[in-house]
């Protein structure tokens, strides 16, 4: 099922600015939030789509990639737009900030975002899709990948402050990140408008990261793919996701592996299957053939006389290695018999002569089948 356009999901134009995006998100998030729509799966799905769209479009780098490549920018080796790269419910930034504003005003701050001292926040988790060959899954490999992500600013070491200066406790909220205001009979708590909930202000922001404590950069990482890895395996690289803000801990990077289909082998766990076509005469008279295996060797298969289609030959320990084990699966050779095509006149004559001199013993399966079929139909005429 094709993903909806992020701009259409939020109901904004492709030229919408940050303020328009945030306003549209707030409105839709309030409408479809699970707390307001309990046991409504459609509302929950819509809520997730709205969050994913906003998390992508609010980030200038992700938005630029989406505008150029669409959803493909976050697939097949790119950063995940939903669930991980977009931050989801667990890490990211804008999503929780906005809901802190929304529900802080509604419920007196009960849903304020958890922040550590000084406004430090954990960075978002990232997703990277990697495709490898069956041969690489067999041997294992070390892959070099490049991941565009936010990293800790090397100038201010993540503090956001200009070197030689320090962040200061916010004078408006006294470091709590929240302020209270009386509205009639109610006291409403909301995010501090001065420090935006961080509890600190930065009078002299770092010139490189502009007070954010992190910058966007493409990093090169080395990923170890163990021998025997299976399709769909997820590898977690702890602390290799986006850097946290204001010196907060980094998120994690998740590598999602897919193994490409192979030209000859099909995989079932640690076992491999290979369909091998042989000639009709080889099947009838017997013979041998060599089959290449993933370990780089060749194995000889002996075909006995009268081999039938579908016959399987097992080559022990010629399959896939079992992940983190000394065990190895088997390779199963499945026989397919190729019927001759484009026969010459002489070949046809010889086959016809062979048919004439054949006995029931030469084809016991077909002879027995048609005899049983005749008996079956005879029961209807009795």
From Swiss-Prot:
Its cofactor is Zn(2+). The J domain is necessary and sufficient to stimulate DnaK ATPase activity. Zinc center 1 plays an important role in the autonomous, DnaK-independent chaperone activity of DnaJ. Zinc center 2 is essential for interaction with DnaK and for DnaJ activity. Zn(2+) 2 binds at residues 170, 173, 192, 195. Homodimer. Binds 2 Zn(2+) ions per monomer. Participates actively in the response to hyperosmotic and heat shock by preventing the aggregation of stress-denatured proteins and by disaggregating proteins, also in an autonomous, DnaK-independent fashion. Unfolded proteins bind initially to DnaJ; upon interaction with the DnaJ-bound protein, DnaK hydrolyzes its bound ATP, resulting in the formation of a stable complex. GrpE releases ADP from DnaK; ATP binding to DnaK triggers the release of the substrate protein, thus completing the reaction cycle. Gene3D superfamilies: DnaJ domain, Heat shock protein DnaJ, cysteine-rich domain, Urease metallochaperone UreE, N-terminal domain. A zinc finger (CR-type) spans 140-218. CXXCXGXG motif repeats lie at residues 153-160, 170-177, 192-199, 206-213. GO terms for cellular component: cytoplasm. Zn(2+) 1 binds at residues 153, 156, 206, 209. This is Chaperone protein DnaJ. HAMAP family: DnaJ. Residues 5-70 form the J domain. It is found in: Cytoplasm. Keywords: Chaperone, Cytoplasm, DNA replication, Metal-binding, Repeat, Stress response, Zinc, Zinc-finger.
């Amino acid at each position: 099922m094709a993903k909806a356009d992020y701009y259409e999901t939020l109901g904004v134009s492709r030229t919408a600015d940050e303020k328009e995006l945030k306003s549209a998100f707030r409105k839709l998030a309030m409408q479809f939030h699970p707390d307001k729509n309990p046991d409504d799966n459609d509302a929950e799905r819509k809520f997730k789509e709205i969050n994913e769209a906003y998390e992508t479009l609010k980030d200038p780098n992700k938005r630029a990639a989406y505008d150029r490549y669409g959803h493909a920018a976050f697939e097949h080796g790119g950063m995940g737009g939903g669930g991980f790269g977009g931050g989801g419910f667990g890490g990211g930034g804008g999503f929780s900030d906005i809901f802190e504003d929304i529900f802080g005003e509604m419920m007196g701050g009960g849903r304020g975002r958890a922040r550590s001292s000084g406004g430090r926040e954990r960075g978002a988790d990232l997703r990277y899709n990697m495709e490898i060959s069956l041969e690489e899954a067999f041997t294992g490999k070390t892959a070099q990948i490049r991941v565009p992500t936010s990293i800790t600013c090397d100038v201010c070491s993540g503090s956001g402050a200009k070197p030689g200066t320090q962040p200061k406790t916010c004078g408006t909220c006294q470091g709590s990140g929240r302020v209270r205001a009386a509205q009639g009979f109610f006291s409403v708590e909301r995010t501090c408008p001065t420090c935006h909930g961080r509890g600190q202000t930065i009078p002299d922001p770092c010139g490189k990261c502009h007070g954010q404590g992190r910058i966007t950069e493409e990093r090169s990482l080395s990923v170890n793919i163990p021998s025997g890895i299976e399709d769909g395996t997820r590898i977690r690289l702890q602390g290799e996701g986006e850097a946290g803000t204001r010196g907060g801990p980094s998120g994690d990077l998740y590598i999602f592996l897919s193994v490409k289909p192979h030209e000859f082998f099909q995989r079932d766990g640690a076992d491999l299957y290979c369909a091998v076509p042989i000639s009709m005469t080889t099947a009838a008279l017997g013979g041998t053939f060599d089959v290449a295996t993933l370990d780089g060797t060749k194995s000889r298969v002996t075909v006995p006389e009268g081999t039938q289609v579908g016959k399987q030959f097992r080559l022990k320990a010629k399959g896939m290695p079992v992940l983190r084990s000394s065990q190895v699966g088997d390779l199963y050779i499945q026989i397919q018999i190729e019927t001759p095509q484009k026969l010459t006149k002489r070949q046809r004559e010889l086959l016809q002569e062979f048919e004439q001199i054949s006995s029931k013993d030469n084809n016991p399966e077909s002879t027995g089948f048609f005899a049983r079929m005749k008996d079956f139909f005879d029961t209807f005429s009795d």
